[in-house]
Each structure stands twice: as C-alpha cells, then as structure tokens.
Amino acid sequence: MTPESSAALAPPARHTTGLDVLAQRPVFAAVLGALTIAFSGILVKLADVPPATAAVFRCAYALPFLLLLARAERRAYGQRAASQIRWAWIAGIFFAIDLELYHHTIGLVGAGLATVLGNTQVVFVALLAWLLLRERLPLRTALAIPLVLAGVTLISGVIGTGAYGENPQLGVVIGLATGLSYAAFLLILRHGNADLRQPAGPLFDASLSATLVSLAIGWPLGELELVPSWPAHGYLLALALSSQVVGWLLISLSLPRLPAALTSVVLTLQPVGAVLLAMLILGESPNAMQLLGASAILAGLLLATVGRRPAPDTT
C-alpha cells in the first residue's frame, strides 16, 4: 500500500453501495455481465459510424453514470490515491487504442469474429506479465498459444475459400493488435488499482482519458462525426450503458469472488454470445473454417484461464 492510500480515512462499516448488493450474487452478476458485453460489437455495427466516433461516444455517454457511481464509492471507501488516478489515466490511452482497433476489426471481419479475436487479450496479459513484470508464465497458457494461433489462422481465411468479412486477413492482424492493446490496458489498470471495492472510479478516469485520446486519434483520420444523429446515437448510448457501465462493473465485481474454474466459463460466454448474436441479429455468416478457428481460440482461452482469475474484458 502506498503512503497516499494508507493516509485515506477508513470509511464507516455501515456505508455500502448498490454494487455491494450485486457482489453478493457473483454468479448471477458474472453471467449477466458477460451476456451484456456480448452485445458490444453488434451495437457498434448497428450504429454505423466511423470507429473513432463510436469510441468517443461509447466512453463519453458513460461518464455521467460512472461519475455518480464513483462518488458513491468515494463516500463509502474514501478518496483514491493520486497515483491510482494517474495510472487509470494512462490505462485510458491504451483503452482508446483498443477501441479504435476493435471497431476497425468489426468492419473487416464482422462483430462476432472481431470479439473472439479481441479476447486473445487473455493470452497477451499472461505473456506481457511474464515478459515485463517477471510473473511466472503458467504452463496452461503456454499450451494454449498454439491453439489460439491455429484459430487465428483459420479465421483469416487463408485455408479454404469463402471466408466471411470484407478483409479477413487484415481483420485478423488488427484483431490481434486489439487483444494486445487491451491486455496493456488491463495490466496498467490492475497495477494502479488494488482496491477491488472501487471499480467505478478507475473506470471513470480511464473512460475520460479514452474519450480525449479518441478525439485526438479521430481528428487527423477524419473519423469524427460529433453531431448527434438518430438512430446511431441511440445505439451508442445503449453501448455506453451496457458494455461500458453495466457489463464492466458486473464482471469486475464478480470474477474475484468466483471459483477460478468458473471464471473461465464465464469469460467465454461473451465471445460465444457475440458470435451467436451477430449471426442472429446481423446475419453474419462465418464459414466452417472460421467457426472452427473461433472454437480453437475459445478452447485456448478456456485452457489458459482454468485455475486462475484473469482480468475481465469489455471489448
């Protein structure tokens, strides 16, 4: 604990937030959170706006709700340390990069497969922690890497014909970059926030940072459409409330309170749900090889996360 955090006044025991009630039902919260986040890519595609525009409003529309929750946390548990706030802002830079890449991937390979590719962050988190933080690389993660790579190859469409997507090969490359940037975001956010009781505060800071960075990214690329339009911004508001607020907070609260093996199943609900929902709602039709590739990646994620509690995903 840093001197700044230890100096914070201990809150009275009677103070609680509405999130504490959900934390007492972690299985329900985790499943609901995973299924909520599964709609993320679908809402981005339905909004049909440029990638940076989707990133800006996804974060900006979430800010008032996150601010209210963050203030409730502060009243209950005290002020977060300045160092924690700085780390959350740095994490927001990588979150903005992740969203920009993810939204491009959706356009190239579809919402379902883009979400599966983004979930390779589970493997990247372990690899980055091993390379940069000198944490032990679990054997299961090492064994999962060939499965994930095989799945990525199949999704790219280089094997067989009739691969779904505008440009599946480029989509795979950008999708892997999505997973890498999201892994960096999660590691930095984890490094700066050891207090699991306060998930909304760091997410507010990271979302505010990501809003500003997304504006900076989108301006030179000509991807900003800042005048609200309907129904696009209805979808973006739904995206902000579902993925950025409700889904993230439910997952953040529940996973640390679940048995490690169960977290693996919960985390795979989101990409599986995204693929199925994209097929049903958007009419996406990955070919057999791409579905096999998605299955290989999901199997790799299960293998990599069994026995540990990986960080949550909100992509």
Question: What are the roles of these predicted feature ranges?
Answer:
Residues 2-9, 49-97, 122-125, 147, ...:
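Transmembrane alpha-helices of multi-pass small-molecule transport proteins
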Residues 53-64, 103-141, 178, 260-279:
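Specific alpha-helical transmembrane segments that line the substrate/conduction pathway
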Residues 39-42, 62-81, 149-165, 209-232, ...:
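Membrane-interface helix-cap regions at the ends of transmembrane helices
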Residues 32-39, 43-46, 69, 89-108, ...:
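Hydrophobic alpha-helical transmembrane segments of multi-pass membrane transport proteins
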Residues 26-30, 83-90, 137-150, 172, ...:
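Cytoplasmic-side transmembrane-helix entry/capping segments in multi-pass membrane proteins
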